[in-house]
């Protein structure tokens, strides 16, 4: 994100809704350190990143998804399963850019949204967890260069992609339940 939108006038901002393992102050501080480390690794003026750390209730999530400044959802999910936040956001009728792998491809329709290319790669030993993510398993890794180009294209031609995604709200309401 920093590399793709550095030194850009009117660059988009990133709202990062995440946690590592807990919603503790220590966890939040560690995530901020990672963001700042990435920012320092990029030469040039980097766009803003806003960290949303912690649990939001359904009304708060709905307000976030439908906020007028929230233009799209981007997820480089590695294939963790269903992807309820993706389904919820797709109901807004705003663009979704997401990995072309896992449970969400059942409802993220490329007629409305963008499925990001990539490939299956072995899970690194440091991310393995016995009984959950075992040795020999793979997950999906987005092609970062292509995804970066796609994000820039969506930003540059947002009206086109917003129009394309508009029908997703009706599609999600009539074809899928939450």
Regions found by a protein language model. Name each.
Residues 95-98, 114-115:
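Short hydrophobic beta-strand element within catalytic cores of glycosyltransferases
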Residues 78:
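Aromatic "clamp/platform" in nucleotide-sugar-dependent glycosyltransferases that forms part
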Residues 69-71, 93, 100:
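A short alpha->beta transition loop at the rim of the catalytic pocket in nucleotide-sugar-dependent
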Residues 138-146, 156-178:
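A charged, aromatic-enriched C-terminal amphipathic alpha-helix characteristic of glycosyltransferases
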Residues 22-67, 71:
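Nucleotide-activated donor-binding/catalytic signature segment of Leloir-type glycosyltransferases, i.e.
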Residues 62, 87-95, 102-106:
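Short alpha-helical segment that forms part of, or immediately flanks, the ligand-binding pocket
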Residues 1-10, 34, 150:
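Short hydrophobic signal-anchor/transmembrane segments that target glycosyltransferases
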């Amino acid at each position: 994100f920093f590399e793709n939108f550095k030194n850009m006038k009117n660059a988009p901002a990133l709202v990062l809704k995440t946690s590592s393992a807990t919603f503790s102050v220590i966890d939040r501080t560690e995530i901020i350190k990672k963001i700042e480390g990435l920012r320092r690794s990029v030469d040039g003026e980097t766009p803003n990143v806003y960290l949303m750390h912690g649990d939001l209730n359904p009304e708060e999530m709905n307000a976030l998804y439908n906020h007028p400044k929230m233009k799209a959802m981007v997820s480089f999910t590695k294939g963790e399963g269903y992807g309820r936040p993706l389904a919820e956001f797709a109901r807004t009728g705003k663009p979704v850019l997401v990995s072309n792998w896992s449970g969400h491809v059942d409802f993220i329709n490329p007629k409305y949204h963008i499925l990001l290319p990539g490939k299956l790669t072995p899970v690194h030993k440091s991310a393995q967890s016995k009984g959950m993510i075992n040795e020999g398993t793979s997950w999906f890794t987005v092609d970062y260069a292509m995804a970066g180009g796609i994000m820039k294209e969506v930003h540059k031609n947002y009206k086109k992609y917003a129009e394309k995604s508009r029908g997703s709200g009706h599609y999600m309401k009539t074809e899928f339940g939450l």
